[in-house]
Every structure is written in C-alpha cells, then in structure tokens.
C-alpha cells in the first residue's frame, strides 16, 4: 500500500499527494490582483474622478459643464494585431458632457472624444506600442494619523504625531526635551501646539485647559505660547503665526491667514484623505479602540433610561466593550459641543465624544479621552474635530494611554493597484484640462459655445501615455516562462512615485515583519539593492477595497471551541486582536482540538494556550508563501536564502522544446500554469470537434461552436519562443476553464519548467568543482535541454534629403552568392539558414551628390537617374545572430499600415535559433542549487548504475552541506522512487512528505533503504569506492545562455572624445585594460606589449591607421604617436585656464596638432563623412527605438560614437 492519497490536477495528470490537511478553501484566481482592479477603474474609478472635478464653472458662474457618463467603443486593433503593428491595444473613450447656461437655462449635451484608453488583456497585462507590459502594484504608507514614541538621551519618552493625507499638506506634532509640544504645518518651522488649537477658534488658555484637561505638557506649552500683539485677539494672532510660517515675508491679515489655513487642510478640493484615510483616522481616534484596557473615571449610563451601563473605577474588558459599543455609536451618548470663536478657521460648532479615565502614570489623575465624533466616510478632508481629537490622543500618550504605531506594520501600509494608479494619473490629466476649460469659458461666446469647443484632451492623453510609457511601475513584462509572467503580475513594489527610493530605504522597511504572514511572501524577493523592497503577494491573500492585504482564516466557534469551515478574511490590524492556531494543529473529526495545549500566534509572539483561547486557525500551510515559493517541494527543508534563489530561478527557466512536469511536485503547478495566461482555457463546456496544431473547435452543449486559435512560435518579450500545443483529442469532453492547450513550459496542463534527468551526487575528475556541472552527451543528442530563441531585426526604408531609400535586390558591388536567399524584392525567404553577416533585407540609400565632372554629367544626361550613386545599407545578421528565418513581415504605407513619419516600408525579419545545452550555460534545481555546465561527456564515459544506465548529470556533493538546502536530497530520493513506481507525487510546502514518507516510498520502490547505490566508472568499468546518492531531480536550464554572452571584438567603433574602443557586447566593444592590468605588464617588464595596448590598440588615431597600412604592405610598424586621451587631458587643463605646453627633451615646445582635415586626407581617413553617417544612423535608431529597447538595454550606449577605422582596436585603456 503506497503512502499518500491520489489527487487529480486537471483531466490529464494524477499525483499521489502526501498532504494531511484537507483543503477547505480553493485558491483564488491568481491574476485577480490585476483584473479586478482594472474592472473597478472602468466601473467606478473613472466616474469618481469626473465627479471630483466636475461640474466646472467659469469665473462669473454663467456657464457650467457637467459629466453625464462615458462609453468605450470597439478597440481599433485586436490584441494580436496590436502586437504585430507595434500599436497599443486601446479603446476610444467617448464622454457625454452637459453644458448649462445659467442665465438663459439653455442646456447642450454632446459626446466628446477623450482619447484612447489602453485596455487590459484577459491575463492582466497591457499591450503598449506592440510590447506587453505589466503595471506593478505599489506598497505605500496609508493615509491616516500616526503616533511614534522614542527616547531622548536622558531616557525620557518623547512622542511624535503625523497626519498623512493622500494628497495635501502634512501636519506634525512633537515634544522636545523640555516637555513643550510643538506643531509643524506642511514641513515648516515649528510653532507651539497651542497655536494650532487657538487657530481652530479655541482662544483663551482657560478654554484650552477645559477642553484638554490640566497636564504638565499642556502647561509648559501654554507658557511658551505668549501673547505678542495685544491689538490682535489670541485666535487672530495664532492664524497670523501660521501664515507667517507658510508664507514668510508676505503681509498678513486675519482673513488671508484664515483662508490659507482653510485651503491647506479643510478644503475638499485641495486636501484629500481618500476613503482609506478617513477610515484609518476614524478607527484610530474612536473611543471604541481607545477605552479598551482603561479604568473609567466616571459612571456611564443609558441616555434614554438613565440605567447604569458601567460603573466608575471599572476596567474596560472585551465583554464590557461589547456592552458599550452600541452606545458609543449613538449620536447622543457623551457628546460635547464646543462653539469656536467667530474668528477661527471654521465658525461651525465642533462636536466630539468625551469619556474620562484614570492616568496610567498617576492613577489619581483623571484624563479626558476625546474622539472626533461620528464623521461620515465620504468626508475626505480634515475637520477641526479631527485636529482636536488627534491632539487629545497625543497628550494622552504622555499618560501612557493609547498606542504608538509601527509604520512597517501591514495595517499601516496599503497597496495601490493598477486601477488606483491609473485613476490618479487620469485625475492629473483632468485637473490640467479643467484650467483650460475655465479659460475657454471666459473667452468664448456663451450663446454659441459647445462642450467640444471647451475641451482640450491633450493633457489627458499625454498623462495616460506618460504613465504607460515611462512610469517606474509600468514594466516590460517578464516573459521567460508562465511562472515569470504570473509572478510579475503579483509583484508588490515599495519603489516608484510616492514610494521609497533604494538609497533611503533602511533595514527595517526591507525586513520581514510578522504581519507578512499570509500576506506577503517572506521568501521571494530579489537579491541585490532591491531586497525587501519588492515582494510577492502570498498565494491565498486578497486585497480589500481600502487596499489592505487580507488573508483567510478558519473561524473557531466561541461556544463549542471547534474549528468550523467558515472563512474570514482578516487585515493585519484586525488579526492583532486574535490568537491564531497554525494549520498543522491536530484536530479530531468533529473539528475539536486534539491536544490540551496548543502552539499559536498572537501579534509577533508564539504562545502556548488552551483550546478555549483560540479565535482562528490557519486555512492551509502554503498560505504563507507566494506561488513561486509554493512550487518548491521540501521547501521546509531548505535554508531560506537558498529557497529565495530557488524561487527566483524558476522564473528564469528557458522554455524547452519537449518539457516534462516534475516527478516530485507540490500540487501548485496546475493552478500556476492555468492562471498565468499562457495556457489556452476553455470558455465553456462542450465536445472537441476538430483539433490540429493551429486550431481547436469545441461544440458547446447548446450547439454553438467555439474556435480557439493557438499561438505558434511567437517571439516573447524576452526573445523566447512562445508556442502552444493541444492538450485535448478529438471527441474529448471539455468542462469550462479546462486547459485545452499547453503554453510554453507546460506539460499536461501543469507547469513544466525543466526535465527530470538522472542525477548523481559525486565528484568526477574535478569537472564539477565549485558548482560546475557535468552533463552526459545524451542530453545534447536527444534535445533534452534544447530551447528556441527568436530574435527580430528591423529595416526601414525612409525618405532622405537626397531621395527615398529603396528595398531592392540590386545592390552595388555584391556578388550573386550573397543574394541567393533573397526574393525578387530583396527580402530573405522564410526557412533560409542565415549566418553572421548575411544579408536579410537589401537596401540602398542615395549618396551625397558631389560636383560632377563633364564626363559624369554626360553619362547622367544619357542614362538618367541610374548613374546617381547609391550606397549599400542592407540589414545584415549581427554577430551571433545566425539561425533559421522563421517569419518575415512587411509593412508599407500603401497597404494602410501605420508607420512613423518619413518611413515608407518597414521589414521585420524573425530568426529562430535552436540552442542545445552546451558548456557555459547556467542550470539550476528548485532549491537554489545553481551552477554552470563545465563539461559534456560522451555517454559511454559517464558513471553508470548496476543495471547499466548511465547517469545524466553529476553534481558536486560539496554544494549541499554548507548551503543547507537539504530539500534537493529528499527530492532526489523521492524522485527516484516515483520513477521506479511510475507515478508522479505531490508534496505541498509545510504539509508534504516527511522523512518517513520518503523512506517508505523508497522501500516500496524496491530501492536500497539509504537511497544510495554502487556506481561504476564508465571509462574503466570499475565500481567507485563509496556508494553514491543517485536519483531524479527536476533540473532547469536558465535563460543565462553562453550564446548571449560570448563576445570578441575585431574592428569596432570608438568613443568620439577619447577615441578609445567602446565597451560591452551591445556596442561590439573591447575589454578594458585597466590600471591594475597595466601594473601586471609593468611587473613583467613587457614594455612593447604595454605600449601597443596603450597606443595602437586604444586611442592613437594616426598610429592605428599607419600600423594597419604597414601590416597590409608588409613593412615595419612605425613608432606610435600621441594618444588622443593625452590631447583631451591637455585641452581639459587648458579649459581650466592653465597654460599647459608639451616640451621635448631639449625643452622645445611640441605642437600638438589636432586631427585636422589635411592630416586625415593624407591618412586616407574619410572621417567627417563617416562621422556624419554614423551620427545619422544613430539618430534614426533613436527615433525608431521601441519602448522595449529602452527597457531592455541597460548598457550605457549613449556615448557619441566615432566610426570604426580599418585598423584593429581590440583593447581600450
């Protein structure tokens, strides 16, 4: 009897699962993070923005423009067409506006075009300029009021408060060493806190003391706040003090001061808390939260009946709070109204709720707790009640009443998703447009003006374009494989506009916080400068309407103390109130806890409690980690640093031509592939009527026919082959949302990132030293690790000043053999095999016309245009770009294709390369066990098993102990057993096969009980001394392939100023011979070698041409001249005003001649025309550079480039 139980993943794969916990909750759809948010934007977000900004009235109030509604029309291109035409997948947006003339009552309604709105594809990405992009969600501080506590050098606790809006000025309170409280308004210099209280209209000291109660801090602050100008009242003076700070040096009046303070904090148009800010402030300041755990200093009675609810001197517990809560929600319970002075910022009465409690510092003293009353959720600005209640909370902290906030707590950080980011951008565009509308209203004739004439959509279009094109959060989608796509869509970044910057982010922000549990993955984050700033959403987490991450828990019944199947989603601050048991806690069949003492979590502590104290229980162990981490079997046996690498490396797996899903999986593979958007999913149930490589047709039960088109060998964003293959047969019955076609790296509907080779952990002739990997030639011969890379190359024929460029087969000075694969138009045929330097698209460009001689003029007159000189500017295969021409696309203006201005024809050629695994490629397992291929050995030389099977891969056993990723060994043994038994297994993270399960399965497979075996040397046939661990592990080939990195320079471009060779593969650059390398040659005394490296091969412009000439003629190479960088140095020093001259041995001045035209003519360097040519090419390249190139090449190729001389410049200084 085998261990575990059988689970079906889709219709085509069965696995034996070792999980022991029943699944009470299905995984949510993994791309909902994106799709739900965009849907909200279309349904509600756009309307919210219009409602905020409209109606727009002119300055006299005659005209008023109102929003009625909007509709999206049919997109111009489908998703595939947008990709092909380098266009944006977007729908035209039409807004219905109503213009009312208030004087005549005339109403004009009109539909106005508001530009194209990019649409989200079904899988959660956008197509912008032909490239697929993802908008990454942003993790930011939530608006609200925050209290911090710190200790000064004398050990006294000092507190600070910050009121953070979504949009608007900050308000900060702080205490100093002398116990005086201060306020900062909008980051200006500080003022005594009582100045702000007086500005609210609470003028006299006695009123302030009555409102806030007597305390040392308040008294010290009042002493500091003296009445300077008796001519002004205290309120007017306070308003002017604040004005003075905000507008220093300007003349101040009471009215202007009042309106400025109003505009900063109380004007709904200028100050916005957003719904989340209002929710957080109401929650923080409400008495419900503040009374808990306090001792009441007054008796509380029912306002209607006078019946006592709670007596004086009672400590408020959970039970008492349950009794009190309904009263605290009433508008007539303990409410106090203050009437501010008429001079205050707002003259309206201020209503707050007040209850007295005893101080925690001095239990005799009464402290008044004040809430901000009951303010509606739709009040987005601050109110005087908010300000006074926040000050009251600040003073109460001195009496140890209230709590300080941790800004890294996920209750205080929220997610801005696509919808909100887009809405903010839309709001910016609309606000810019509003100004234009107002101006036009006052200019145009009110009787004839229409909405269309008032609107200028440019700012809106520009704002949206800018967001999708260049925002830090709009990213080129990672398309190495479906797991990479999915992870990218679920990514949470703390960077970006309004977020943190890499340099300013400290250790605390990056660290794992206890609130990450079930919300953000503690494992998956990049290595390097972004560590901890970019996170991945946990697998079961969802995001609520306020943008806080919620995670599911099973509710424990309060009366029976049994675990129910009722699921509650809790935010981080809700979770702080409960004690939660882990998902592995043993339960009886009826849901009661088996044990008397249970290990549980409470805030950041692990506690041991009795079952009656437990409020909730985890749903499933894998709710803690992200999708990529949940795909690592035996994650619980890996060190977290290596698990992080494993999670990241799975995203870099190159799609293989015949992938196999892992023998040892985790059960997450099916859902990850299904939701990634790479698989083809059935829209409705039915029967397969037709299937081939390009199309699947399914007849629904109601008789309608669905047609599904498969993607064939499309180039993905990362130059990988994106190919779909059918997963169904003729006559199969299909249910809705079944996988009917596998995408790249998929097998039977499951994620299949690599292969399952036979792996031995043994050293072999030092070939696998230091993480090197030794492979069997079988993996090359049988195309086990073969992947396809597809690169596209473009050539454009444009209009130049001298006439149009032409795409043609007639190229000057090119032999017929070079044209053998070109068709009649000069374009390479599909299927041709091309090598470096071959012509892909023949193109000629008119040359500059020089002064013609008499004979040439005669020829010109006889033969017409033909004698005009053209030069060959054909598109050729770049270094390392050879392969098979897979597709050619031609776009012309005549055919109606949209091309950039000045371009008549564009040809795009796709070249596919079949890349077998080879020395230098990077490979990895799922446990962060990465290495590079060091040797590919003949099959017959590989170590073999007793039955003669040669192993496929030899890994070094030394890579395991120090790295502590033992998961790979357990996977190895279980994989071997699974292959022997002919099964696939699933071992979910934290709830999978334990050591006993692994050894039981190994025994059932008839293997030795230690999982090791005798291994024979393939070269001698002798057995090795020790038994070796051999088994099956899922091993991946990563995208870091040696073909993309290998590079050698022959003759190439030089930097314009220093005349030294450029660097990097992208620029066909040289290898830098740096200062330390120079020391090495000096140490050897290799003077001539050093001299040629520093002159001919680098920046001696004249010398390198002469050297080339001498080599060609077979003469002695002349002495080198002065390096160009020396001239540059002299010029730099002269530009600083220093008189620098160069003298020879006899102190005679040497004339440092610049490279003028005479010398270049003498040297036969056509420098100027070449430079002009290069610069023109560069300019064209920049103009046509697609957004994806911007994203992809992070080389610093922006230096000006001088042409390649005929001489060789291998090395730069």
Curated annotation (Swiss-Prot):
The gene is rpoB. The RNAP catalytic core consists of 2 alpha, 1 beta, 1 beta' and 1 omega subunit. When a sigma factor is associated with the core the holoenzyme is formed, which can initiate transcription. It catalyses: RNA(n) + a ribonucleoside 5'-triphosphate = RNA(n+1) + diphosphate. GO terms for molecular function: DNA binding; DNA-directed RNA polymerase activity; ribonucleoside binding. Keywords: DNA-directed RNA polymerase, Nucleotidyltransferase, Transcription, Transferase. Residues 1153-1213 are annotated as: Disordered. One of its GO terms (cellular component) is DNA-directed RNA polymerase complex. DNA-dependent RNA polymerase catalyzes the transcription of DNA into RNA using the four ribonucleoside triphosphates as substrates. Pfam families: RNA_pol_Rpb2_1, RNA_pol_Rpb2_2, RNA_pol_Rpb2_3, RNA_pol_Rpb2_45, RNA_pol_Rpb2_6, RNA_pol_Rpb2_7. HAMAP family: RNApol_bact_RpoB. Its EC number is 2.7.7.6. InterPro entries: DNA-dir_RNA_pol_bsu_ext_1_sf, DNA-dir_RNA_pol_bsu_external_1, DNA-dir_RNA_pol_su2, DNA-dir_RNAP_su2_dom, DNA-dir_RNAP_su2_hyb_sf, RNA_pol_bsu_bac, RNA_pol_bsu_CS, RNA_pol_bsu_protrusion. Belongs to the RNA polymerase beta chain family. NCBIfam families: PRK00405.1, rpoB. Residues 1171-1198 have a biased composition (Basic and acidic residues). This is DNA-directed RNA polymerase subunit beta. It comes from the Bacteria. It is an enzyme of class 2 (transferase). One of its GO terms (biological process) is DNA-templated transcription.
């Amino acid at each position: 009897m085998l261990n575990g139980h059988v689970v079906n993943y889709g219709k085509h794969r069965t696995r034996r699962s070792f999980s022991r916990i029943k699944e009470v909750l299905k995984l949510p759809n993994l791309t909902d993070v994106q799709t739900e948010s965009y849907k909200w934007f279309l349904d509600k977000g756009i309307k919210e923005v219009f409602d905020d900004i409209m109606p727009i009235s002119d300055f006299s109030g005659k005209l008023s423009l109102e929003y009625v509604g909007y509709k999206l029309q049919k997109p111009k291109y489908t998703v595939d067409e947008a990709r092909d035409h380098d266009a944006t997948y977007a729908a035209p947006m039409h807004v219905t506006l109503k213009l009312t003339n208030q004087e005549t009552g005339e109403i004009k309604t009109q539909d106005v075009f508001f530009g194209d709105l990019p649409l989200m594809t079904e899988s959660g990405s956008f197509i912008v300029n032909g490239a697929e992009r993802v908008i990454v969600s942003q993790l930011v501080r939530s608006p609200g009021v925050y209290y911090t506590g710190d200790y000064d050098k004398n050990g006294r606790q000092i507190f600070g408060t910050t009121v953070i809006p979504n949009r608007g000025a900050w308000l900060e309170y702080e205490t100093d060493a002398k116990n005086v409280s201060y306020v900062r308004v909008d980051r200006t210099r500080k003022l005594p806190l009582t100045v702000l209280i007086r500005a609210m209209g609470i003028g006299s000291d006695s009123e302030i003391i009555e409102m806030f109660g007597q305390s040392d801090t308040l008294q010290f602050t009042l002493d500091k706040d003296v009445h300077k100008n008796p001519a002004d009242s205290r309120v007017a003076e306070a308003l002017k003090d604040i004005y003075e700070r905000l507008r220093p040096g300007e003349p101040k009046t009471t009215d202007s001061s009042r309106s400025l303070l109003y505009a900063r904090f109380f004007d709904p148009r200028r100050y916005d808390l957003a719904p989340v800010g209002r929710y957080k402030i109401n929650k923080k300041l409400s008495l419900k939260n503040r009374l808990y755990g306090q001792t009441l200093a007054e008796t509380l009675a029912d306002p209607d009946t006078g019946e006592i609810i709670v007596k004086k001197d009672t400590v408020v517990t959970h039970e008492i709070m349950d009794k009190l809560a309904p009263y605290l929600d009433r508008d007539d319970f303990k409410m106090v109204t203050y009437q501010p002075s008429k001079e205050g910022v707002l003259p309206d009465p201020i209503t707050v709720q007040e209850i007295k409690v005893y101080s925690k510092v001095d239990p005799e003293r009464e402290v008044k707790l004040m809430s901000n009353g009951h303010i509606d959720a739709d009040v987005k600005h601050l109110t005087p009640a908010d300000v006074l209640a926040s000050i009251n909370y600040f003073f109460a902290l001195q009496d140890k009443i209230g709590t300080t906030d941790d800004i890294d707590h996920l209750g205080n950080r929220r997610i801005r998703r696509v919808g909100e980011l887009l809405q903010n951008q839309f709001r910016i565009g609309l606000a810019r447009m509003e100004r234009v509308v107002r101006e036009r209203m006052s200019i145009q004739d009110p009787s004839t003006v229409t909405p269309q004439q008032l609107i200028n959509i440019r700012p809106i279009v520009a704002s949206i374009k800018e967001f999708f094109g260049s925002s830090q959060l709009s990213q080129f989608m990672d398309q190495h494989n479906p797991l990479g796509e999915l992870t990218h869509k679920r990514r949470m970044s703390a960077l970006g506009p309004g977020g943190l910057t890499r340099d300013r982010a400290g250790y605390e922000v990056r660290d794992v916080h206890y609130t990450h549990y079930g919300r953000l993955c503690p494992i998956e984050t990049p290595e390097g400068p972004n560590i901890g700033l970019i996170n991945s959403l946990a697998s079961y987490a969802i995001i609520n309407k306020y943008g806080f991450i919620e995670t599911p828990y099973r509710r424990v019944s309060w009366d029976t103390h049994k675990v129910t199947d009722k699921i509650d989603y809790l935010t981080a601050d809700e979770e702080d109130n409960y004690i939660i048991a882990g998902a592995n806690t043993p339960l009886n069949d009826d849901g009661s806890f088996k044990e008397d003492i249970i290990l549980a979590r409470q805030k950041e502590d692990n506690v041991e409690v009795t079952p009656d104290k437990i409020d909730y229980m985890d749903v499933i162990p894998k709710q803690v980690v992200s999708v990529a981490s949940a795909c690592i079997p035996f994650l619980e046996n890996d060190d977290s640093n290596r698990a992080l690498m494993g999670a990241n490396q799975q995203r870099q797996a190159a799609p293989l031509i015949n992938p196999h899903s892992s023998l040892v999986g985790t059960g997450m593979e099916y859902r990850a592939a299904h939701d990634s958007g790479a698989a083809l999913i059935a829209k409705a149930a039915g029967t397969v009527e037709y299937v081939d490589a390009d199309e699947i047709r399914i007849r629904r039960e109601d008789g309608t026919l669905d047609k599904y088109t498969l993607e064939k060998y499309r180039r993905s964003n990362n130059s990988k082959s994106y190919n779909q293959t059918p997963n169904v047969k003729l006559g199969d019955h299909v249910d809705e949302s079944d996988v009917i076609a596998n995408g790249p790296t998929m097998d039977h509907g499951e994620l299949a990132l690599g292969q399952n080779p036979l792996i031995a952990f043994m050293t072999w002739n030092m070939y696998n030293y230091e993480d090197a990997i030794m492979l069997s030639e079988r993996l090359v011969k049988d195309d086990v690790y073969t992947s396809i890379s597809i690169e596209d190359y473009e050539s454009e024929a444009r209009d130049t000043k001298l006439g149009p460029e032409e795409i043609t087969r007639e190229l000057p000075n090119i032999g017929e053999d070079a044209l053998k694969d070109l068709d009649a138009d000069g374009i390479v045929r599909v299927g041709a095999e091309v090598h470096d330097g071959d012509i892909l698209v023949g193109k000629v460009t008119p040359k500059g016309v020089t002064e013609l001689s008499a004979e040439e003029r005669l020829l010109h007159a006889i033969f017409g245009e033909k004698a005009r000189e053209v030069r060959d500017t054909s598109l050729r295969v770049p270094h390392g770009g050879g392969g098979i021409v897979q597709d050619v696309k031609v776009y012309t203006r005549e055919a109606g294709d949209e091309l950039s201005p000045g371009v008549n024809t564009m040809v795009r050629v796709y070249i596919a390369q079949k890349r077998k695994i080879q020395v230098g490629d990077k490979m990895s397992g799922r446990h962060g066990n990465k290495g590079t291929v060091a040797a590919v050995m003949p099959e017959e030389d590989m170590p073999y098993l007793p039955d003669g099977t040669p192993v496929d891969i030899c890994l070094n056993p030394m890579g395991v102990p120090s790295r502590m990723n033992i998961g790979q060994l357990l996977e190895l043994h279980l994989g071997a057993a699974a292959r022997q038994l002919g099964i696939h297994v699933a071992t979910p993270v934290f709830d999978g096969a334990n050591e006993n399960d692994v050894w039981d399965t190994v025994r059932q497979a008839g293997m030795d009980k230690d999982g090791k075996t005798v291994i024979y040397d393939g070269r001698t046939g002798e057995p090795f001394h020790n038994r070796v661990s051999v088994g099956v592990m899922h091993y991946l080939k990563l995208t870091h392939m040696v073909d993309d990195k290998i590079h050698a320079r022959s003759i190439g471009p030089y930097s314009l100023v220093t005349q030294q060779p450029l660097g990097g593969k992208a620029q066909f650059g040289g290898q830098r011979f740096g200062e330390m390398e120079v020391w090495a040659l000096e140490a050897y005394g290799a003077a001539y070698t050093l001299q040629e490296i520093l002159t001919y091969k680098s920046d001696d412009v004249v010398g390198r041409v002469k050297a080339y000439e001498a080599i060609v003629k077979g003469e002695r190479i002349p002495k080198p001249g002065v390096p160009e960088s020396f001239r540059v140095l002299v010029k730099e020093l002269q530009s600083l005003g220093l008189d620098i001259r160069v003298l020879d041995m006899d102190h005679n001045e040497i004339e440092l001649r610049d490279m003028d035209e005479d010398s270049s003519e003498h040297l036969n360097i056509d420098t100027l025309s070449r430079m002009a040519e290069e610069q023109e090419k560069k300019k064209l390249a920049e103009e046509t550079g697609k957004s994806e190139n911007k994203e992809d090449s992070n080389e610093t190729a922006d230096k000006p480039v001088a042409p390649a001389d005929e001489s060789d410049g291998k090395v730069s200084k």
